[in-house]
Amino acid sequence: DDSASRGLGDVYKRQYHRLSHRVRFLWAVHMSHHSSEEMNFAVSFRQAWFGPISKVPFFMIMPIMGFDPTIIAVAGVVSTLWGIVGHTQIVGKLGPLEYIFNTPSHHRVHHGSNPQYIDKNYGNLLIIWDKMFGSFEPEKKPVVFGLVNNVNTFNPIKITFMGWMAMLKDMRNSLSYKESLKIFFGPPNTKTRSGSF
């Protein structure tokens, strides 16, 4: 059934997005998207250079799991278009749509560096998954956009590699190979959620 495939695909994309915030090497890829201190349509195009490389292994599994490649492609286009619309401060709350969809309000929360907004609202098209998994947070207080400690640069090279540089530095300073692996695959902490290295 196509609608079941779309629903499962949406939760699958949500899980990948969550991993992009909870696994440090994936956060090193994704954090450039969150480094903007503004929230507007242009932020949706501020994508990681290595994002496609990190997504390929994850999303290649979908056809193996039985997802129709055509539906995956169409869902990818819809998701991209919805993602552009979601990066705005122009659109306020959308009434009953807020209960089901990942609206601009919900996505503003996701881009917030306010403590109560960190690691919230990973949803792709639907916000119901975040409500089910306990990662939902409504927009209540004004959102402070950007990283915990912002990058203070517009240099795209620095923005792209800042997470990698900080992670590699921590790995170099680790006491063992096992500790290095924990740094690479472990969660980012407050320090590594920043743009300083």
PLM regions with names:
Residues 1-12:
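Single conserved hydrophobic/aromatic residue that forms the stacking wall/gate
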Residues 9, 33, 78-82:
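Transmembrane alpha-helical core residues of multi-pass small-molecule transporters
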Residues 16-33, 98:
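Juxtamembrane helix-loop transition segments at the membrane interface in multi-pass membrane proteins
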Residues 31-47:
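Juxtamembrane helix-capping/reentrant segments at transmembrane boundaries
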Residues 38-42, 85-197:
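Cytosolic/stromal cytosol-facing helical appendages immediately following the last transmembrane segment
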Residues 48-61, 123:
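Core segments of transmembrane alpha-helices
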Residues 56-64, 80-84, 128:
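Alpha-helical transmembrane segments of multipass membrane proteins
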Residues 64-74:
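Transmembrane helix interruption/hinge and helix-loop junction motifs
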